[in-house]
């Protein structure tokens, strides 16, 4: 505490002290008779002394020593400041005023008492520094005291006054600490720090809330703590009082809706209560929803949740047994229930937050990362209920290290066998926290896996089934490799990989081992992870019909071998012009169209025939279901000329059945253009043609004529009104009749 300055002592106080010192001279001198009369003093000094004596006489029966000063500690959660108001307590009972007579026979006891009562006025603070000096010795305010502001020391509020405090209204009687709020000490000095310095306040600020979509918006001040969402309202005097408290364990779902300009946070409780929050901006609303979700997920990380609050109850020694029992019952009721989390990876969550990931385009993009005991997943912001965009097994993490290449001190790398994540946070401290959490989670996951594998007997490779081998291959498939299946990879350079192998993280390039580029992924590998294996690149085959084999890494070869027979390539969607430039592929698509037409006949016949067709084409049923869908094996067979003979063999079996079957042979068409009575079938593509709109079959020679499809004409005429039929000359030729109206379809 600073010492008193010279300017803080008023001249009136100095004169008053000189006046009080005169009593000491009277006590030390010889006792003799004195006549108390009127003394001549300056006018301003006389008024000051008379006022002091009058005020002292009014309160002489009150205990106005150091307990007469009551300090009110005001905390502001908005501006992180503390304001202290010095308030003098004025007692309710006024005593009878004393008067000094001219009688010289005053007892020495009464004189000493009067002198002591007057000298007690020196304890009043007359400046700001005086007020601060009395802080340590001043007793604390207790609820229920009657405060009087008629005797307040003057303080220059322009210099030290802060905005109105944001605090909860104190209730009368015993105040029970909420089991979900921060613990309080019996000594109120524990609350001297501002609320914003508490680590359990995750977010705070001003919002607008409403409890139903039809109600009006109300402005409020909100805080998210570790266990609760507090809503504060303002009264007429501007003070903020707690109006609602929502326990985070009772929140069932959190959704964010609205447009790009305005976002709303919708909160639904387990008891069907509804709360809607609106912030000043869309990003602020998203942040509120994110902080709520993080606080809910953090509840799963508190196994001794109930014992924490029982310890808080034990510290409150002044609670009665009845109140303590009530509080314990409330703790049992408010124990957080199991959260309804859609994704299994979100169980046992260790850490969540927003991180920035470096994309292929060398841009930093924000994602919501969730670290659990088994996975490290990335979600789209505000889309936490959906499936993760990226997901990695945490036990497969190879290394976690700082990344200082881009000039940021808050960048770090999380290295997995199939991918390298370059992440960035706002501060270096937060990056270090994420690194420590990932390393500890990976170590614990490896220890648990090793403990589980010890009692199990390892199977030999000879006894492993085909499904086990396929399952082991699926574990190596990643989203990054799958996205490059139909896209040409770009070489990003060794700098993007920090001059490390994408497989084993061994240093490569420059003076280290020679780097080898993978033609499929564009990543660089060492000579151990890249042994110059040759493979057809699907993207080069689709876009350039490049049938040559290129050098790929072991990872890429393993991935391509796994998806080799999977129908993942849609030629019509990726490059439809390929049918024009590659005759072999155009011939195959015609055969598949013919097989698709035969499928309709055989699947509408007896079940034995349909089962025979499935058996002949198994497991590639997509060949007659989606005619433009290919696997990498199919495209290689097209190049080698093996797919067309395979399809012709199946077509021969199906056509022989249709011609010989009494049921299927009756499902033919008659050319409505020539009407010669010959039965036509849609799979006879060499001699027939089919309407794209209605599916009618005609002769190929008849289709050359520019005559619209008669079946489509009939459908169009059925939609016309009666007035149209009166104008139509049905005796005329078909061309004249068709020319009288405009058809809404293309001519065949």
UniProtKB/Swiss-Prot annotation:
PROSITE patterns hit by this protein: PH_DOMAIN
UniProt domain PH: residue ranges: 200-297, 348-443
Gene that this polypeptide is encoded by: plekhm3
Ranges of biased composition (kind: Basic and acidic residues): 129-140, 148-159
Transmembrane segments: none
Region (Disordered): 88-107, 129-187
GO MF terms held by the record: zinc ion binding
Gene Ontology BP annotations: myoblast differentiation
Zn-finger (Phorbol-ester/DAG-type) residues: 656-709
Function of the molecule: May play a role during muscle differentiation.
Name of the protein in its database record: Pleckstrin homology domain-containing family M member 3
Keywords: Cell membrane, Cytoplasm, Golgi apparatus, Membrane, Metal-binding, Repeat, Zinc, Zinc-finger
Keyword Oxidoreductase: no
Main location: cytoplasm
Domain of life: Eukaryota
Recorded GO CC terms: cytoplasm; Golgi apparatus; plasma membrane
Cellular compartments annotated: Cytoplasm; Golgi apparatus; Cell membrane
PANTHER family xref list: PLECKSTRIN HOMOLOGY DOMAIN CONTAINING PROTEIN, PLECKSTRIN HOMOLOGY DOMAIN-CONTAINING FAMILY M MEMBER 3
Organism listed in the record: Xenopus laevis
